[in-house]
């Protein structure tokens, strides 16, 4: 992973800055909008395994993340790791999180809202002043004792964020202001005690399961069982299953089925290899079982997929 670079472009007003990221194994784009004094909205688009940036240990900056596509992982200073799935939202202070993001599916699209609490409190959005909301209390509410708050996907979050991904440019500035106000009012109403928190995983657990993932995806013709992996890597089967799903979003079996089929789809588009050979390469000895699995995932037969995608 590579560090965050200087802005590639910045407008004359200081309203928008664009960062093009070389992540070592992929690329990323971060578009930063200064919506209010002390409040930024950042659009994140990554096709990479992760990204790093310069360390920022300001305990008075609150970071709110929303995952639109893919998965996003963060490592807390305690050493614990937590992961967001599609539609999830997280809140933490900048000083409680390592200056990096990981993307287990090598694809991530989401929005971050950064709030400098002191600056925002000095010049708050008008609606906050009118409602008597003290934005400084958000830190104690959501990040008490260094906690990170996670909210699972729900309709209220979807309502606030979904429209932000398709705002016409001519309306973007007033719309971002409106949506930031809506988000802050929504967070004011959240009852933290009623939100079930996501499991956090230790760094050693995460690194071990990532090694297992690497093993599983390196040779698709092999199909080790969970019990075999558990013995080989000295990890409890329940811990392996739970941690794998927490990182990658699916049980091992379902994840590997989809992974195999996605690899097969690439081969169908990019090569002239026969369907039978492709099935064998990704671990299906029976071509009819491969065809059935392919239809389950891609909703189309392999031969028809190759034809429609203009495969070689």
Name these PLM-found stretches.
Residues 1-5:
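Polar/acidic, low-complexity leader/linker segments enriched in S/T/G and N/D
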Residues 10-109:
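N-terminal functional module of multi-domain proteins
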Residues 210-218, 222-223, 227-228, 246-288, ...:
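Terminal helix-turn-helix DNA-binding modules in bacterial transcription factors
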Residues 291-312:
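…primarily DNA-binding HTH/wHTH and HhH modules…
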């Amino acid at each position: 992973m590579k560090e965050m670079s200087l802005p590639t472009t910045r407008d004359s007003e200081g309203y928008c800055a664009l960062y093009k990221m070389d992540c070592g194994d992929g690329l990323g784009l971060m578009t930063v909008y200064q919506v209010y004094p002390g409040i930024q909205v950042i659009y994140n688009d990554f096709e990479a395994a992760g990204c790093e940036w310069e360390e920022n240990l300001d305990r008075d900056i609150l970071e709110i993340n929303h995952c639109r596509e893919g998965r996003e992982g963060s490592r807390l200073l305690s050493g614990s790791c937590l992961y967001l799935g599609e539609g999830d939202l997280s809140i933490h202070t900048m000083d409680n999180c390592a200056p990096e993001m990981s993307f287990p599916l090598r694809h991530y699209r989401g929005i971050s809202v950064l709030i400098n609490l002191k600056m925002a409190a000095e010049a708050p959005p008008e609606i906050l002043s009118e409602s008597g909301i003290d934005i400084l209390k958000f830190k104690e509410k959501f990040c008490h004792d260094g906690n990170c708050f996670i909210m699972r996907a729900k309709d209220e979050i979807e309502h606030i964020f979904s429209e932000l991904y398709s705002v016409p440019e001519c309306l973007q500035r007033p719309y971002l202001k409106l949506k930031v106000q809506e988000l802050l009012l929504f967070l004011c109403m959240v009852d933290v005690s009623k939100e079930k928190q996501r499991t956090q995983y230790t760094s050693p657990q995460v690194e071990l399961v990532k090694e297992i993932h690497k093993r599983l995806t390196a040779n698709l013709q092999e199909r080790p069982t969970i019990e075999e992996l558990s013995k080989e890597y000295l990890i409890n089967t329940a811990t392996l299953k739970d941690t794998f799903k927490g990182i990658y979003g699916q049980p091992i079996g379902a994840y590997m089925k989809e992974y195999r089929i996605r690899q097969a789809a690439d081969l169908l588009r990019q090569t002239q290899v026969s369907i039978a050979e492709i099935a064998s390469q990704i671990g299906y000895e029976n071509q009819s079982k491969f065809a059935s699995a392919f239809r389950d995932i891609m909703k189309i037969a392999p031969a028809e997929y190759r034809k429609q995608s203009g495969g070689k």
